[in-house]
């Protein structure tokens, strides 16, 4: 791919490039990597940084979103529209992985 995201997912069928990539920003990377993902046609990029999830979706009209390399910052995933982002964020922030998984499962049922 030219860049290695922390996680990547193809939704529905396998493809050459994933539909969704997730980056955990610790010291470097971040929004500037959108330029690379845009060239690859990655539909959605999530950045986890400082206990916050930022979601960017690639738009057809790249000129309208030049500041973010053709991506629009959005509050709800368009690749996974049924996903409750608030529940996901709360679960990620839970210090107990077991309790986090349980709370997330209960929240989606």
Model-based region annotation:
Residues 1-40, 46-109:
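C-terminal interaction segment
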